[in-house]
Amino acid sequence: MRHNIKFKSKGTLKIRNTAQISLWKKCSDSMIADQTYLFINRVQDRRFDEESLRILELSLVAMNVKSFLEVRSRLRDFMRSESVVIFGELTGESMVAKLSVLEFFARAFALLGDMESCLAMRYEALNLRQLKSPSCLWLGVSHSEWTKFAVQSMENGFPSIAGKASENALLSLKKDSLIEPKSEDNSDILDAAEKVRRLRDSAASLTSSHSGIFIYIVSSLKFAVCNRLLTTF
């Protein structure tokens, strides 16, 4: 969902801390500095819209390599820190607002090259939809959405999360098969389930690999922390 969402923050938005000022000054070009600072201001003003993402993208494209690497790193830290505050402010907001903010952060993290945080946002959006789907059928998550997310997680080096998504995809496929047990589509469901099982098994094999287990544990912990945070929704 890509709605333009702006809600009132419970904090004081106009105060800029020294870390943000330092980030702004790291940009050597005044136009780039203005764009970067403008993006920070818009996030603090809770303007989670296409314009904010466009400003972020333009500021990153215009940077030289040295500025890009340093400013991108600082923006990642800023967005991670700000997300914790913002998610605490979402209690009481509509489901559309919550999902839209998660989508905004997922896309912003993707632009910043932080795929771990990007996938965390998408994972929580899928979980939130699934959690609320019994009372709001339109929020239901299809097996294809879970499968697509599992593939993306594998491709970006997070097989532990891919395994969890695969399990959710299999549960969704099982429900589909119970709804239409004799339909012509049932064979397609069985084929899809077999592909997902292979994906799940591959993810499990990689997750248990000793060489990368620390990375996967850290990733899992980050998702778990984010998940506990969003249960207050």
UniProtKB/Swiss-Prot annotation:
Taxonomic lineage of the native organism: Eukaryota, Viridiplantae, Streptophyta, Embryophyta, Tracheophyta
Annotated keywords: Meiosis
Tissue: Specifically expressed in buds.
The protein's name in its UniProt record: Protein DOUBLE-STRAND BREAK FORMATION
Function of the protein: Required for meiotic double-strand break (DSB) formation, the initial event for meiotic recombination.
UniProt note: phenotype after gene disruption: Reduced fertility upon self-pollination, producing polyads with an abnormal number of microspores during pollen formation. Meiocytes are defective in homologous chromosome synapsis and segregation. Homologous recombination is severely affected during meiotic prophase I.
A biological process from GO: meiotic DNA double-strand break formation
Quaternary structure annotation from Swiss-Prot or TrEMBL: Interacts with PRD1; this interaction facilitates a binding to PRD3.
InterPro entries reported in the protein's UniProt record: DFO
